[in-house]
């Protein structure tokens, strides 16, 4: 299955949640697209679980097969499966770049990582799904610092709050990972228990 590259607002409307963050088109029409978008539909338990799983997938830009692997890894962890799943998703490098305010959207963050603009602990990483660990240090590469996306990020620093589990330092926009996030530090509008129930069937 190919990665979805179509209009994200349409997916946001279908799943009734802002998958981008600050999507003005979604705010104007927060109901499903199509002729019968405003109609009230009785939602089954399965549909609610499926929608929650899809919300998580599209929020973090993860394909179904990879998302399933994340879930299976979360099951093996000692904590609550749903919380472990969110922690895995939050620790992706593209998400960390987004959370740090160096990209306006996760999709943009993914592109910046893919283009090789970052190092992790001094090693260049161009894999968006790379998982960061506690005490990792993420730097913008020297030759990338003056490119337009990072100039904009410096000018707009502070517009979006940076979560307390990471820190952005100075003009070099270094990201320090103090810890991996707890559930209370993850502000995505997801009910992770519904995802667990979906895969538990």
UniProtKB/Swiss-Prot annotation:
InterPro entries: Ribosomal_uS4 (IPR022801), Ribosomal_uS4_bac-type (IPR005709), Ribosomal_uS4_CS (IPR018079), Ribosomal_uS4_N (IPR001912), S4_RNA-bd (IPR002942), S4_RNA-bd_sf (IPR036986)
Pfam families, per database record: Ribosomal_S4 (PF00163), S4 (PF01479)
Domain S4 RNA-binding: from-to ranges: 91-157
Record-level GO cellular component terms: small ribosomal subunit
Highest taxon above the source species: Bacteria
One annotated GO biological process: ribosomal small subunit biogenesis
GO molecular function: rRNA binding; structural constituent of ribosome
Keywords in alphabetical order: Ribonucleoprotein, Ribosomal protein, RNA-binding, rRNA-binding
Subunit-structure text: Part of the 30S ribosomal subunit. Contacts protein S5. The interaction surface between S4 and S5 is involved in control of translational fidelity.
Protein family membership: Belongs to the universal ribosomal protein uS4 family.
Functional summary from the UniProt entry: One of the primary rRNA binding proteins, it binds directly to 16S rRNA where it nucleates assembly of the body of the 30S subunit. With S5 and S12 plays an important role in translational accuracy.
Protein name stated in the entry: Small ribosomal subunit protein uS4
Annotated source species: Mycolicibacterium paratuberculosis (strain ATCC BAA-968 / K-10)
